[in-house]
From Swiss-Prot:
Chief site of localization: cytoplasm
HAMAP family: Urease_gamma
NCBIfam families linked: PRK13241.1, urease_gam
Designated name of the protein: Urease subunit gamma
Keyword line: Cytoplasm, Hydrolase
Reactions this protein catalyses: urea + 2 H2O + H(+) = hydrogencarbonate + 2 NH4(+)
Family annotation (CDD domains): Urease_gamma
Subcellular location: Cytoplasm
Pathways per UniProt: Nitrogen metabolism; urea degradation; CO(2) and NH(3) from urea (urease route): step 1/1
Quaternary data: Heterotrimer of UreA (gamma), UreB (beta) and UreC (alpha) subunits. Three heterotrimers associate to form the active enzyme.
Amino acid sequence: MELTPREKDKLLIFTAGLLAERRKARGLKLNYPEAVAFITCAILEGARDGRSVAELMSYGATLLSREDVMDGIAEMIPEIQVEATFPDGTKLVTVHNPIV
């Protein structure tokens, strides 16, 4: 199977997001890379589902709370930017204060 670097990046994000989802489901607090992957993966999937940029910006800020992440992680992530593919092209989705 031949994959472009972008496709490899998306698979890596998906794998990390899936791992974070499983750890969260088991009640574990997420660390920095897990929290970023969890939110990023959800945004990429939302774009694939046809949701708008505005919807995903709001949605991204509802996925995790401070109780879901290790101490200090929320302060380490003031925003997350994701380049997602929408039906009408690639767009940048910025989620401000993603962990409240």
